[in-house]
Regions:
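Short, well-ordered coil/turn elements that cap or connect secondary structure elements
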Residues: 28, 51-53, 117
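Short, well-formed alpha-helical segments that are part of the catalytic scaffolds
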Residues: 7, 12-32
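Active-site-proximal specificity loops/subdomain of glycosyltransferases
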Residues: 3-6, 10, 17-18, 43-92
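Short beta-strand/loop segment that forms part of the nucleotide-sugar
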Residues: 26, 31-40, 60-61
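Conserved donor-nucleotide/metal-binding helix-loop-beta segment in metal-dependent transferases, i.e.
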Residues: 102-124
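The conserved acidic donor/metal-binding loop of glycosyltransferases
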Residues: 94-98
């Protein structure tokens, strides 16, 4: 079983998001983490690079300001990251979410349990 995680982030430092903790919280159970990083006005990109984990794959993108209306740009940027995932499971995590270490084994067990179940499309 191969597990991908994915997210998108822009100006995470300015916005005060715990994006580094977010990324690190799920890294132990994934095989790759795709991060779509928009052109930030802060050190978001260099902070992500400082994690220095071989599982992390960074995609740099430009956000289309025309799509900001009603948050369309967020959906677009999320999908850019998701489409670059190569795992059997694609685990979406936002820059302000952090998973507790005690839950990681339960999450992994559920993914293993339902990996080949055609009736299960997602875990929530």
């Amino acid at each position: 079983m191969k597990v991908s995680a994915f997210t998108f982030i822009k100006n995470g430092q300015i916005l005060g998001y715990p994006f580094l903790q977010s990324i690190k919280s799920i890294l132990p159970i994934v095989d790759e983490f795709v991060i779509n990083c928009g052109e930030s006005e802060d050190d978001t990109l260099s902070m992500i690079r400082s994690i220095n984990d071989k599982k992390i794959r960074i995609i740099e993108s430009q956000w289309n300001d025309v799509m900001r209306d009603r948050g369309y740009v967020y959906g677009q940027q999320k999908m850019i990251a998701q489409y670059n995932c190569t795992g059997d499971w694609a685990f979406y995590i936002e820059g302000d979410e952090v998973y507790h270490e005690d839950d990681l084994e339960k999450i992994k067990e559920s993914m293993e349990l339902y990996l080949n179940d055609a009736n299960v499309e997602a875990l929530v």
